[in-house]
């Protein structure tokens, strides 16, 4: 855990795929932005840091286990968090779920007073945990996560239901049990029921608001 006097405060939100992490992150961002302004708060998704696979064939890319820590470029994310804390802008990678690789373009992210970082594997990496001022684990039952994941991946990411189910059985559930669920022990706050937990969101807003005082 880092000292709260740092210029840029990093808040980590982790949990299973489709647990409601993104909803909590976007809700906190939207509501706090209305209070403090867009220049003071931002969101960075861990998904942007999936490793570049442009050197692989599409057949090889689709075999990648996206739920294993090795699929993530956490070294780059770590360097970017350090840069933001120094007051430097970063070039955020852009990842395509259709092409299964990183795109050539990037998105410039300026340092903010508060950065909300969200992703499934954030708490599995000790380097990232050390950069966080505090961390949250969204604890949603796996059956609910699966239903949400099917709806999301089919509608938003161009996947078939069969491919989503096959991936869930082969990698998503096993990797959750092996890596993601055990990382819950490192969270400072555990939020049940995901983005629908209004009381938890209000508590988190109050906690984060302290960094703007």
UniProtKB/Swiss-Prot annotation:
Keywords: ATP-binding, Cytoplasm, Kinase, Nucleotide-binding, Transferase
Catalytic reaction(s) noted: uridine + ATP = UMP + ADP + H(+); cytidine + ATP = CMP + ADP + H(+)
Residues reported in the UniProt entry to bind ATP: 15-22
InterPro entries (alphabetical): P-loop_NTPase, PRK/URK, Uridine_kinase, Uridine_kinase-like
Entry's Gene Ontology cellular component terms: cytoplasm
Localization per record: Cytoplasm
EC numbers on record: 2.7.1.48
Record has Chaperone as a keyword: no
Pathway participation: Pyrimidine metabolism; CTP biosynthesis via salvage pathway; CTP from cytidine: step 1/3; Pyrimidine metabolism; UMP biosynthesis via salvage pathway; UMP from uridine: step 1/1
Primary location class: cytoplasm
Stated family: Belongs to the uridine kinase family.
Protein name per Swiss-Prot or TrEMBL: Uridine kinase
Organism: Salmonella newport (strain SL254)
Gene responsible for this protein: udk
């Amino acid at each position: 855990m880092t000292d709260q006097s740092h210029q840029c405060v990093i808040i980590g939100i982790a949990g299973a795929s489709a647990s409601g992490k993104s909803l909590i992150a976007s809700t906190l961002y939207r509501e706090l932005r209305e209070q403090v302004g867009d220049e003071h708060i931002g969101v960075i998704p861990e998904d942007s840091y999936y490793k570049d696979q442009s050197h692989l064939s599409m057949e090889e890319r689709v075999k990648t286990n996206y739920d294993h820590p090795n699929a993530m470029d956490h070294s780059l994310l770590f360097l970017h968090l350090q840069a933001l804390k120094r007051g430097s802008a970063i070039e955020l990678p852009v990842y395509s779920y259709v092409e299964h690789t990183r795109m050539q373009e990037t998105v410039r992210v300026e340092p903010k007073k508060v950065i909300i970082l969200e992703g499934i594997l954030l708490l599995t990496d000790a380097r990232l945990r050390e950069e966080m001022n505090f961390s949250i684990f969204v604890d949603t039952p796996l059956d609910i996560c699966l239903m949400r994941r099917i709806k999301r991946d089919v509608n938003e990411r161009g996947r078939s239901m069969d491919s989503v189910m096959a991936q869930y059985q082969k990698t998503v559930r096993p990797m959750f049990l092996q890596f993601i669920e055990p990382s819950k022990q490192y969270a400072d706050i555990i939020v049940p029921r995901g983005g629908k937990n209004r009381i938890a969101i209000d508590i988190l807003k109050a906690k984060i608001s302290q960094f703007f005082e």
